[in-house]
Amino acid sequence: SWSDRLHETLTLLHAHAAAWVQIDEPKFRFSIQQNLLPNERGLYYMRLHGRNAQAWWSHARAEDRYNYLYSRDELREFADAADAVRRLVGRTYVYTNNHFSAKAVANAVVIKDLLREPIDGEYPAAFLDRYPEAAEAIRAAARARAHRVTARIP
């Protein structure tokens, strides 16, 4: 893996001003190494694939590999890392892997909540029912928006 040749990989990335993609995946003995540190000032890129170790290599459908909902505690590690590095780099991106049942959206909502970023948009009732942690973050953001609007009315 390219993470096994760390010095060579970082030299190549630096030569092209390219960011190391911080990948989260199930941890196997041959998994990509992860340190969550930025290697370039301009860009930080984190991608969360999920930790579905049971279906990672053996699955009936390709999407089964990414069928994973992170807990709030698991996401806190990534939110904390993103919060720390966004003060050091130009742009910070945290991507959650797409999954047909909107787990990526639920994970992204919780990350935004942990980062105290705005949570906008409309979410179907079925989504709110299925993902209670995301639903609580969405409802709290809506209450905060309503409070700000109410506070401005003379």
Language-model features, listed with the residues they occupy:
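Residues lining hydrophobic/aromatic ligand-binding pockets adjacent to catalytic sites
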Residues: 1-154
